[in-house]
């Protein structure tokens, strides 16, 4: 084509002119520029293509390089990938099997559904009382646990565990049958079902039954809390519940039941002896009795309890239980005795505080005490206070309060509380004397008040104590040989000692000593005072016996067995009224040997009298004797000369004794040797000094220490709280020492 064009152009060039050639030249030049432009565009486009190709080549090289690097470790991971595929295959197979198991389990005809309902059936059996079926289900649960292959299944494991754990719930439900009213036949069935349970010993069964009975007992006590007669109701509840439990226990657990040993126990281990069945029951009874006594004590703190009714009910309850082989009367007696002692001590302290706590002056009625009537009481009647006591209203109120406290002891008049009673009264009198000396020593009625306390109140309290606790009864109960003198010394409210031990003793002793000063027989006027009103009814209370050495003469005085209580009280009243101790120092220092017929007066002098040694009194104590009414016998002898003949005396012996008495009065310089009227006095046989009262508590403690009493339940002469330092710690004083103190 180009050759054709060039050919034509050559023809044209030859044929065209210059203008035309110029025009063609311009056209060619423009076409050349267009071609150059196209060439430039083509060159530019080719460069971009080359650049893109280069970048693509670089990227491809990089990509292939990375691929090469990654494919290098692919061979190393091929083994791990293979094992992962194998594991995946196994899991897929297991999942397929489980899927198949679930599909079978969803079938309602599968026995697994019955197995899953066993826990709920177990609960229904327990609540409905089908204890035999419940026990069978628990045994089935144990069998499932023993089958290892089945127990590995989570469903079966859960069911088996629930059935076994329900055994504790079954036991609790069975034992709860005892936490309510008892039915003996039903209770026996329950115990038989409980005995089927393994790993439950006989003692555990007994203790569990008693514990659930305590739960029921506590529920009943809570129901009556706050009632007015709560204590009486509580005692009745304790009695009924404990009796029912005792009957059930003896019916279910007989005494002759043989306790079997555990065959699985290793004989090489140390084994403790098995307790007998009754020991558990006894300890349970004692524990409940202690709870009941604690309940009574707490209730008594809030408000006073009628201890008389409580004592009666508790003793009746203890007696009924004692017939069944469980006697807890010593425990009740010990606890209630302490409670009664505490109440008596508190009542006396309150009465004393009411008297001494008032800041009022001592106000008394201005009546001459001599114009007041004198009361005489029958031998067996309660003592009557002196009429002078009614002149002081505050003291009358105090005395009545103490008498009320003593009357509160009527239902438990045991010598065990005697020490507490005496100590409380002594402390009360001492507090009153201290109050008078510290607050009312300047009062116009101070001396009169002290006299009333010393001569009216204290003797009246002594009579009350002796009336409530007769010496003969105390000696009979304890089998003691304590004489009446020792007993009266023990309960004596010694005003001299109390006055000396109180604060402001100097002021009190100035008044007490003259009141209690002993007077001679001549000062008293014994002939007029002791003159018998009915001589025909009076009988001598002493007799003389002949001895081998002395022949007809003096013998030891012996108290007649038929001596009445009235004669004893007459002696005591005369001693209190006249302040005279008929056992003078003369009779205290005389030896117990009879006086020989030809004994000279020099043998009775002071130098030849036997020395008084208190420490030897306990070695050879004389035969105990009752206090004698010496003054009455002397008066009868003075007014009835025939009495000497009745006593076996001769006129010669009478003259000798009169002369001896006269010599004693003349030669003796001791203050306690008083002048005696020979016309009215009869020589009294000398009485040896009796031992002091200190050994009483020891003897009684030894006598009763073997009693079956709970620990810390003492049955001795009083308790540890009732110590009296004045009597127990003081030795018997000789007449010489007494005279020195009186001076």
Swiss-Prot record:
Chief localization: Golgi
Biased composition (Acidic residues): 704-726
Keyword Transport: yes
Gene Ontology annotations for the cellular component aspect, listed alphabetically: Golgi membrane; Golgi transport complex
Biased composition (Basic and acidic residues): 563-581, 594-621, 633-647, 654-664, 727-743
InterPro entries noted in UniProt: COG8, Cullin_repeat-like_dom_sf
A biological process from GO: intra-Golgi vesicle-mediated transport
Key words, A-Z: Golgi apparatus, Membrane, Protein transport, Transport
Subcellular localization, as worded in the UniProt entry: Golgi apparatus membrane
Pfam families recorded: Dor1
SUPFAM superfamilies: Cullin repeat-like
Membrane topology: Peripheral membrane protein
Stretches for region Disordered: 549-672, 704-743
Keyword Protein transport: yes
Function: Required for normal Golgi function.
Subunit structure of this chain's protein: Component of the conserved oligomeric Golgi complex which is composed of eight different subunits and is required for normal Golgi morphology and localization.
Family: Belongs to the COG8 family.
Protein name: Conserved oligomeric Golgi complex subunit 8
GN (gene name): cogc-8
């Amino acid at each position: 084509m180009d050759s054709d064009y060039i050919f034509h152009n050559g023809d044209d060039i030859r044929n065209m002119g210059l203008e035309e050639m110029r025009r063609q030249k311009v056209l060619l030049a423009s076409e050349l520029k267009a071609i150059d432009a196209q060439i430039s565009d083509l060159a530019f486009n080719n460069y971009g293509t080359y650049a893109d190709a280069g970048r693509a080549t670089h990227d491809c090289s990089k990509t292939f390089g990375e691929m090469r690097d990654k494919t290098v470790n692919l061979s190393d991971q091929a083994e791990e990938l293979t094992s992962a595929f194998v594991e995946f295959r196994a899991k897929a197979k297991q999942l397929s099997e489980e899927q198949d198991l679930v599909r079978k389990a969803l079938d309602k005809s599968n026995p697994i559904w019955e197995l899953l309902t066993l826990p709920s059936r177990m609960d229904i059996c327990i609540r409905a009382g089908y204890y035999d079926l419940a026990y069978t289900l628990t045994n089935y649960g144990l069998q499932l646990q023993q089958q290892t292959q089945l127990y590995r299944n989570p469903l079966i494991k859960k069911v088996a565990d629930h059935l076994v754990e329900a055994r504790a719930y079954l036991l609790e439900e069975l034992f709860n049958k005892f936490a309510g009213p008892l039915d003996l036949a039903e209770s026996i069935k329950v115990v038989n079902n409980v005995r089927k349970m393994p790993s439950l010993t006989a003692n555990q069964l007994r203790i569990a039954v008693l514990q659930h009975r305590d739960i029921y007992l506590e529920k009943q006590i809570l129901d009556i809390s706050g009632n007015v007669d709560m204590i009486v109701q509580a005692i009745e509840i304790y009695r009924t519940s404990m009796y029912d439990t005792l009957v059930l226990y003896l019916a279910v657990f007989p005494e002759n039941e043989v306790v079997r040993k555990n065959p699985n126990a290793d004989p090489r281990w140390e084994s403790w002896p098995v307790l007998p069945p009754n020991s558990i029951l006894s300890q349970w009874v004692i524990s409940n009795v202690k709870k009941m006594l604690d309940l009574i004590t707490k209730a008594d703190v809030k408000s006073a309890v009628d201890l008389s009714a409580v004592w009666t009910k508790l003793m009746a309850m203890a007696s009924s239980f004692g017939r069944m082989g469980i006697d807890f009367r010593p425990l009740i007696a010990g606890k209630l005795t302490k409670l009664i002692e505490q109440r008596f001590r508190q009542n006396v302290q309150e009465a004393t505080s009411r008297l001494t706590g008032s800041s009022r002056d001592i106000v008394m009625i201005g009546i001459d005490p001599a114009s007041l009537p004198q009361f005489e009481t029958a031998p067996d009647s309660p003592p009557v206070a002196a009429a002078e006591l009614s002149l002081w209203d505050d003291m009358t109120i105090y005395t009545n309060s103490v008498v009320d406290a003593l009357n509160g002891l009527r239902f438990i008049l045991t010598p065990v509380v005697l020490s507490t009673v005496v100590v409380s009264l002594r402390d009360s009198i001492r507090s009153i004397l201290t109050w008078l000396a510290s607050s009312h020593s300047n009062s116009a009625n101070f001396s009169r008040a002290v006299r009333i306390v010393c001569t009216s109140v204290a003797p009246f309290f002594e009579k009350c104590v002796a009336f409530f606790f007769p010496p003969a009864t105390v000696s009979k109960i304890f089998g003691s040989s304590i004489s009446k003198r020792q007993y009266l010394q023990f309960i004596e409210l010694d005003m001299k000692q109390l006055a000396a031990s109180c604060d402001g003793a100097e002021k009190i002793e100035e008044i007490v000593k003259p009141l209690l000063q002993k007077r001679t027989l001549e000062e008293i006027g014994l002939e007029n005072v002791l003159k018998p009103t009915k001589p025909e009814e009076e009988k001598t209370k002493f007799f003389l016996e002949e001895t081998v050495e002395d022949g007809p003469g003096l013998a030891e005085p012996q108290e007649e067995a038929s001596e009445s209580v009235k004669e004893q009280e007459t002696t005591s009243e005369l001693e209190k009224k006249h302040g005279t101790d008929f056992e003078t120092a003369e009779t205290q220092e005389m030896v117990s040997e009879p006086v020989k017929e030809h004994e000279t007066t020099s043998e009775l002098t002071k130098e030849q009298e036997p020395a008084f040694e208190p420490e030897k009194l306990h070695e050879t104590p004389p035969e105990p004797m009752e206090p004698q009414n010496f003054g009455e016998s002397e008066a009868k002898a003075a007014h009835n000369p025939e009495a000497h003949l009745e006593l076996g005396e001769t006129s010669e012996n009478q003259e000798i004794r009169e002369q001896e008495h006269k010599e004693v009065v003349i030669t003796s310089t001791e203050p306690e040797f008083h002048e005696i009227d020979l016309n009215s006095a009869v020589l009294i046989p000398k009485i040896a000094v009796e031992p002091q009262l200190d050994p009483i508590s020891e003897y009684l403690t030894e006598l009763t220490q073997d009693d079956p009493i709970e620990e810390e339940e003492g049955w001795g002469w009083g308790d540890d709280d009732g110590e009296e330092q004045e009597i127990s710690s003081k030795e018997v004083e000789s007449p010489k020492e007494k005279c020195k103190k009186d001076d």
